[in-house]
Amino acid sequence: MPNSKKSKKGGDQQHVTIVPVEPVKGENVDTVAYSSRSRISGESGHLIADVQSPHAKKHRIIFDRDHNVFEFRLLDGSAKHIIVYRLDELLSTTCYPFKIKNGVPIIPTKPTTSDKTLYFNFVYKKDKQKWRLKQIPVIFYTTSERDYWHSLIDTTLRRVKNRPKNIIIFINPFGGNGKAQKIFKDNVDAFFWLTPGLRYKVVLTERANHARDYIVEMPPEQWSAIDGLVSVGGDGLFNELLSGALLRTQTDAGRNIDNPSSHLVTPHIRFGIIGAGSANSIVSTVHETNDHATSAVHIAIGSECNVDVCTVHQHQKLIRISANAISYGWLGDVLRDSEEYRCLGPIRYQWSALRTTIRHPIYRGMVQFSLSHKENVNPKDQLPPCLEPCPVCMKPQGNDKYDYHWHAEFTHVICCVIPTVTPFTPYGLAPFTGIGDGTLDLALVPRISRFHNMQFMRKVAMYGGKQLYELDPSLNCYRVTKWSYQPDADQEDPGVWNLDGEILEQPKDEPLHFKLHPQLISFFGRDAAMVKPTKRSFIKKRKSSIVYQ
């Protein structure tokens, strides 16, 4: 592209080269004056500029507006040294540099604008899980040319539909051992600050259910204006955001959320989590890491994936909503016991696990369920006979709500909405289910000994649910769409549920019903297998600091 060209009148006039959709050569390339660039119809074509690196190496930038990619090419007489970035990998462009520490930007207090340099701030995949930011400085030949590119790219990024424009961030100041605010300030805030067109409001929660009530009571004009809700805390805070948004959406749509058979409406907003809790299983499952900067990157660039949700009902009334894991028996008792030792921090779970193992709780009850169409196994061929007396077996016509049932003594009853990756289950708890595959994994473990239970939990941590399903014959696991549990009435303690890290009391004389709602919500995240890690070459970087970062 001509960088500046003397006009016949003696003045300087900026030119921009636009290449049409079908590449042509010679005289068919249009040269459009800077002052008349608004005449360019649509957003197609190629924008080209010859630039320099900080080491004075000549390069060419091509912005392909048809395919939304940037091509950086070293002009050394060969076509070998080229790198291409997608538009959705560009966080922003700035006219000033800023510090980047371990791939995390630091907001400058007094940014100093460079004369002709434009800084491209790209996000990239550092390894198999983590995402980081890198800055590519590009030196144009004139300041006006630099400003034009900056204005054009900034406007383009603001128009990207999937990028959030207005989000509310809820921070639990007690999360992460009281470090949630610091986590947000040091690892997240700068990403949002750099994102063009992103407005965000921070709300510090003051009590339990504060976030849920805030969302439910939000004025209609504010609710319709936001397009994202972000939690900085543990799974409990995210559950508040999820519950509040779903309640608000169903109320506005006139849906009866208390009815398990209702077809629920998907909220218009997306959810994000910055993990600052003890387990952080939801964010670890979606991103395959609990890394704060990675979560911030996916929110800022507008990554999106759909996630299943499970509603919990008692007597035709909604009592809880889950997008993680629901467990009963040993795991529920561990959570209940750990509440007495919150002062110990995350280590309280190990202490309570030891205490619960010694106590070795066993619960007798009835599990009923209906299989997903993706399940190929017939439970009647695998499940042992029911304990007698079984209320369903005694009925001549069985149960019209569920296809299968099992009355037994249980050590574990576990339902996974997502694979459930945690520090204690790094390979995932669920054998089969995915993030949004439209199934629940229902795992039933009958009465087993203390030693067997210790071996069972050790195998879960070492191999994950998928390998455990093949190693332990006591595990009965099925892919279901709905199910229920009712404890026997003669038990003094009906037990509790561990629902997304929060305690849910099991009624003594009534069943709880669990219903799957496939891909009900959208999450700021993407399939980890879609993008390969970026490989660096320090030798080649000497040749081009733009192409080889």
Curated annotation (Swiss-Prot):
GO biological-process terms attached to the record: ceramide metabolic process
One Pfam family this sequence matches: DAGK_cat
Binding site for substrate: 233-236
Keyword Electron transport: no
GO terms of molecular function: ATP binding; ceramide kinase activity
One cellular-component annotation, GO: membrane
Record key words, sorted: ATP-binding, Kinase, Lipid metabolism, Nucleotide-binding, Sphingolipid metabolism, Transferase
Pathway: Lipid metabolism; sphingolipid metabolism
Coiled coil (UniProt feature): none
Protein name: Ceramide kinase 1
Gene: cerk-1
